[in-house]
Each structure stands twice: as structure tokens, then as C-alpha cells.
């Protein structure tokens, strides 16, 4: 799904990431569902962008970002202060935005473990799982709170909604619902 990144077109016009991937996939005979997922998996590009509309696009968007985040966490590379040269906060924010609309999302920790195991099996890298999970939990806690803030949820209501902890993907959706319910009272 990253073949378009090697093209001159995407180098010249970065906004065509995904769009060109879809076109290349269709030209090479890929199923239109797969081609659309390739186009969508870059979304959301920022907090004002919408998540992918197709199920395959949402799955690919989350899987790609979780792979990236887990890989960097395994190498002990995490955002610090204002420094985030690899766009890890943006990647985590994208996962949160996608999962916020999913009622049956798999656990974040399970996705992280699967990504770490894939690094071990495919690349021979053995990440310290506990360290990776701890690092990613901190990052996702921050991103979920930022997401609720972007929704206009007051600070005290965000804190109350997040009191139960943020371990699973389903908790992202639950935290959003709790915060919105508290805000409506």
C-alpha cells in the first residue's frame, strides 16, 4: 500500500499520497475494494480530516499506524516535548480518530503485541513488550485526551471520562461516549 511513495508524482505532490496508490493498484488489476483502502489508509491526515469510510480502509489505517508506532516504541523513539520528527503523535491521533467511531475495535494492547510479534518474526527484532506497551499507553492516553479536548469537552469532564483507564481500543469509544454524556448534562 506504499508503492505510490516511490513515484515521482507523490514526491512532487505529497497530497496525492494514497490517491496515486489507488490508481496504480487499479492499473495493476487489484480489487477496487483494496484500491480504495490504499487511498483511504492515509486518512485522517489531521484532526479536521475524516477517518476512512470503508471497513478495509479503517483496518489498514489503524494497522499501518500501529505498525509504525510499535516499531518506533520498540526502538525507544517517542515524541518528547515539542519534538516529534517522525509524526508519531499524528499517527496516534489518527488511530484514536478511527477507533472513536468503532464500537467493536480490537484492544489497542493486542494490536501492539501483534505488531511487535511481527517485527520479531519478519525482521528478527525482539522488542521488550512491557516497555513498548508502557510507552504507547502514555502516548495514547495523551492523544485520547487531546481528541476529547478537540471535541470541546471541558477539562474536568475529560478527566472524569478517562478515570477508568485507557487500555483497550473499545475504551476509546467508551471514553468519547462518557465525555459526551457528561457534557450533555
Across the structure, where does each feature detected by a protein language model lie?
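Amphipathic alpha-helical "coupling" segments that flank catalytic cores
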Residues: 2-185
Amino acid at each position: 500500500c506504499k508503492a505510490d511513495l516511490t513515484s515521482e508524482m507523490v514526491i512532487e505532490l505529497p497530497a496525492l499520497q494514497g490517491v496515486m496508490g489507488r490508481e496504480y493498484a487499479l492499473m495493476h488489476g487489484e480489487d477496487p475494494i483494496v484500491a480504495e483502502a490504499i487511498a483511504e489508509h492515509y486518512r485522517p491526515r489531521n484532526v479536521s480530516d475524516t477517518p476512512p469510510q470503508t471497513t478495509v480502509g479503517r483496518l489498514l489505517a489503524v494497522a499501518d499506524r500501529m505498525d509504525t508506532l510499535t516499531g518506533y516504541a520498540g526502538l525507544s523513539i517517542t515524541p518528547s516535548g515539542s519534538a516529534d520528527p517522525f509524526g508519531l503523535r499524528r499517527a496516534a491521533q489518527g488511530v484514536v480518530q478511527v477507533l472513536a467511531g468503532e464500537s467493536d475495535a480490537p484492544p489497542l494492547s493486542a494490536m501492539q503485541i501483534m505488531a511487535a510479534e511481527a517485527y520479531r518474526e519478519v525482521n528478527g527484532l525482539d522488542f521488550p513488550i512491557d516497555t513498548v506497551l508502557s510507552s504507547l499507553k502514555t502516548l495514547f492516553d495523551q492523544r485520547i485526551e487531546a481528541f476529547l479536548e478537540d471535541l470541546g469537552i471541558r477539562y474536568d469532564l475529560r478527566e472524569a471520562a478517562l478515570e477508568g483507564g485507557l487500555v483497550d481500543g473499545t475504551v476509546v469509544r467508551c471514553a468519547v461516549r462518557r465525555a459526551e454524556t457528561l457534557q450533555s448534562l
